[in-house]
Curated annotation (Swiss-Prot):
Binding site residues for (2S)-2-hydroxy-3-oxobutyl phosphate: A84, T85, R126
Protein function: Catalyzes the formation of 6,7-dimethyl-8-ribityllumazine by condensation of 5-amino-6-(D-ribitylamino)uracil with 3,4-dihydroxy-2-butanone 4-phosphate. This is the penultimate step in the biosynthesis of riboflavin.
Gene label: ribH
Catalysis performed (reactions): (2S)-2-hydroxy-3-oxobutyl phosphate + 5-amino-6-(D-ribitylamino)uracil = 6,7-dimethyl-8-(1-D-ribityl)lumazine + phosphate + 2 H2O + H(+)
EC number(s) given by UniProt: 2.5.1.78
InterPro entries on file: LS (IPR034964), LS/RS (IPR002180), LS/RS_sf (IPR036467)
GO biological process: riboflavin biosynthetic process
Alphabetical list of Gene3D superfamilies matching this protein: Lumazine/riboflavin synthase
GO MF entries: 6,7-dimethyl-8-ribityllumazine synthase activity
Annotated Gene Ontology cellular component terms: cytosol; riboflavin synthase complex
Name of the protein this chain belongs to: 6,7-dimethyl-8-ribityllumazine synthase
Length: 153
């Protein structure tokens, strides 16, 4: 038997956790995610958005939403841009670990859509210009994973 998630969002309920820090980027990621979900037939009323202060706070809220059992997938969106200190490394590592742990505690897929870039230019490129929109890509992954989990269950 083969399992493959379809890219049809009809009847899916999706939560998005988005960081307000670097909102000039995260707003574009959110727009890309919502647009993609709607284009794949997810009803606007089935998309809930939770705003958190920064990327570090994303995993806790993603975990709580996944544990509720009300959503078919949770998308995480944020942007961490390297600065002059090691703060970047700690935040990136902890956010990635936290989102991974959120996947371990529920049957709800939690999708990692947090940009970790070396520069503002790289972030802008990944938020809807040269390198596409990573929010949109995260939405496609969420739809596919939600449908895949439904098939397996």
């Amino acid at each position: 038997m083969n399992f493959e998630g379809k890219l049809v969002g009809k009847d899916l309920k999706i939560a998005i956790v988005v960081s307000r820090f670097n909102d000039f980027i995260t707003t574009r990621l959110l727009e890309g995610a919502k647009d993609t979900l709607i284009r794949h037939e997810v009803e606007d009323t089935n998309i809930d958005v939770a705003y958190v202060p920064g990327a570090f706070e994303i995993p806790l809220v993603a975990k709580k939403l996944a544990q509720k059992g009300e959503y078919d997938a949770v998308i995480t969106l944020g942007c961490v841009i390297r600065g002059a200190t090691s703060h970047y490394d700690y935040v990136c590592n902890e956010v990635a670990k936290g989102v991974s742990k959120a996947n371990d505690i529920s049957d709800t897929p939690v999708i990692f859509g947090v940009l970790t870039t070396e520069s503002i230019e790289q972030a802008v490129e990944r938020a809807g210009t040269k390198a596409g929109n990573k929010g949109s890509e995260a939405a496609v992954s969420a739809i596919e994973m939600a449908n895949l989990i439904k098939q397996i269950n």
